[in-house]
Amino acid sequence: SALMASPHAFGQAIPQALQQQGSTEASIKEKRNAWTVGVAGGLMSGSYMTFADELAKALDDGDNLRVLPLVTYGAASNIDDLLYLRGVDVAVTQSDVFEYFKNERKIWNLQNRVHYIIRLPVSEVHILARRDIRTIEDLRGKKVSFGPAGAGSSLTGTLIFQRLGIQVEQANIDTSQGLAKLRSGEIDALVRLVSKPIDFFSKIPADANLHLLSIPFSKKFADYY
């Protein structure tokens, strides 16, 4: 291992030959960075990271355009990263996340600070619960995982339960750990927001005694969905 820094940081005199080499290095660095775009994707297990990776493969053009997919906390944190994190130029997120940042977080001039580029496949929200829980209303007072903080499910799930007036004990647990806790009975349900193709649900054994709950549409969240 080694700790390295630019010689400029130490104020050392640089020989002329090294200065010329440094000039060449600087031009290479400038060219490489001129058309490099950082895309905030999401969690490694999520569909948004898959989108970012596919964009990188499809748009790659060497030094003319290089797309770098970035692993992040998820769709809800991606707008924060786009606004404030160095190296993030593009973010994959959801329309409800944007509306939340604009209307609830009241981020100043958000509609002019970020711009819509392209529509991606629609995300679908799923609530996976034990078989003895028949409806979403049965989760009142129960422990529900909304996925990791910053993930799209953490925001969308919270909005849905709040608007329906169903109070639950909210937990923010990684999806794979959440599934294990659901099967062991430590939690009662989990919220997962994904876009196709994701094989998370198809890999759950048929004898796991779990099922998906219906989410009734309500005018209470019609302003978002």
Annotate each PLM feature.
Residues 1-68, 111-113:
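N-terminal hydrophobic or amphipathic helices and topogenic motifs
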Residues 34-61, 123-184:
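Bilobed "Venus flytrap"/periplasmic-binding protein-like clamshell domains
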Residues 66-77:
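Early extracytoplasmic/lumenal segment of secretory-pathway proteins
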Residues 68-69, 89-93, 126-128, 146-147, ...:
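Structural recognition of the beta-strand scaffold that forms the well-ordered cores
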Residues 82-85:
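Membrane helical hairpin/interfacial module
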Residues 95-96, 104-105, 167-225:
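Pocket-lining segment of extracytoplasmic ligand-binding domains
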Residues 108-120:
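A structural signal for short loop-to-beta-strand junctions that line the ligand-binding cleft
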